[in-house]
Amino acid sequence: MPKQKISIGTWITIPNEQITEIIAKSPYDWIVIDLEHSTMSLDQAENLIRIIDANKKKSYVRITSDSTDQIKRMLDAGASGIIAPMIETFQQGKAIMDACFYPCLLYTSPSPRDL
């Protein structure tokens, strides 16, 4: 049986790049950017994701709602994963999970040549 490793991380609610860099240089394995309980914008969160990624740490984002746009934007920015709050039904959970993956080839956006 492989030896299990304990994973340790922390949460960020302050959109400060210098503080994030200090935390990202610490021995944490992962950092959660908390959009639900902060006034942080998506642009600020994207900057923090880049800082965390540059320090070779995992970044997770707790989004404010089950917004597909927020999920896709944070994953496109490089987040390692999403934490979704207040999931109360199977359908909500499935919609969030589906938003985390690219749609199948049958549902792609039209390319410019198709227009």
Residue ranges and their predicted role:
Residues 1-9:
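N-terminal amphipathic alpha-helix/helix-capping segment at the start of soluble metabolic enzymes
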Residues 8-10, 31-33, 59-61, 82-84:
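Hydrophobic faces of well-ordered beta-strands that scaffold small-molecule active sites
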Residues 12-15, 62-68, 86-87:
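Glycine-rich beta-to-alpha transition loops that act as phosphate-gripper elements at the mouths
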Residues 15-26, 39-54:
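Glycine-rich, positively charged N-terminal anion/phosphate-binding segment
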Residues 15-30, 88-90, 95-98:
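Alpha/beta enzyme core
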Residues 38-51, 67-69, 88-103:
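Active-site-adjacent beta->alpha loops and helix N-cap segments on the catalytic face
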Residues 69-80:
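Catalytic cores of alpha/beta
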Residues 107-115:
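Single conserved hydrophobic/aromatic residue that forms the stacking wall/gate
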